[in-house]
Amino acid sequence: MKRRDILKGAAAAATLGFPAILRAQQYKAEYKMSTVVPPAFAWGKGGEIFANLVRDRTSGRINIKQYPGASLVQGDQTREFSAMRQGIIDVLCGAPVNWSGTVRQLGVFTLPFITPDHKALDAVINSPAVMNDYFDLVRKAGAEPLAVGETGFRQISNSKRPIVKPDDMKGIKIRVVGSPMYGEIMNGMGANPTFMSWADAQPALASGAVDAQENPLEVFLAAKIQNLGQKFVTKWNYSNDILLFAIANPVWQSWNAQDQKIVRESAQEAAKQQIALVRKLFSEDVEKVRALGVNVHVPTPAEMKEWQIATRRTYARWKVQIEPNLIGKIEQVVEGTRKG
């Protein structure tokens, strides 16, 4: 065989083999997943379950490594979505309220009392009319949404006094995540909100730089917030964000269809397990917090009405600003649970 023919054959073989080689090279050795908290918390546990399922089901082809403490963004969870867009983060497992400063529409689930109980939340996250629209928003923002879990109902704790009614919030210095809407809710009741990452919040509570914080009681327990001077809790259930599992668009598009299916199904299974864990912890949290010597106030129905009235103006203003059509669909679904 002539040398020229040999070279032609080699070139043809290389050309035929190139796409397969390229596809193999597109898979990274590691995909970085950011979570605000480690697996000791239900939220972080959901991320761990997801990463393990993907690794096992792809035989290690897709290796997702969890980075808790929002360490990929120096502890500032509000920067996670921007960092994903920049290629610093590949996978997100977090509360969209943290990213609503970057993409306002992601915060639709955190309007005050929009999902007042688990029955309402379940109806919303299982509604195709709601979730198809929400997932479209996430895609347009730069990520492929896979599944939703639950971060848990957020409760107030403070070091000063029992908080029974909205007037009790006056003058309280409260740490909130970087959501302008959360800040407005607290301002509307006379509190003094300060935006702070979770990494900065704990020393601020310990030093007395802030008096209060709001988080699920599961977080209160896991982080031992009672040791940071927090003596009083009000279980008012004012906000319950989803836990969104999502992949950066360029990463998602680099995977073949079979692996995309595996990753999506793994996220759905992880979300299911994570929700079950959050619900179990929710059913036990008041008893466990009280056992630590913390005063826990559970509002009566009449008191809950006062809280809802106190946040109504903020709700109306932010409904218009965020995504009124989608929020209208959420309201319809929730109303259906009241009639059922």
Locations of regions flagged by a protein language model:
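N-terminal secretory/targeting leader peptides
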Residues: 2-121, 129-130, 136-340
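An acidic, glycine-rich surface segment that forms the CoA-thioester-binding/catalytic face
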Residues: 125
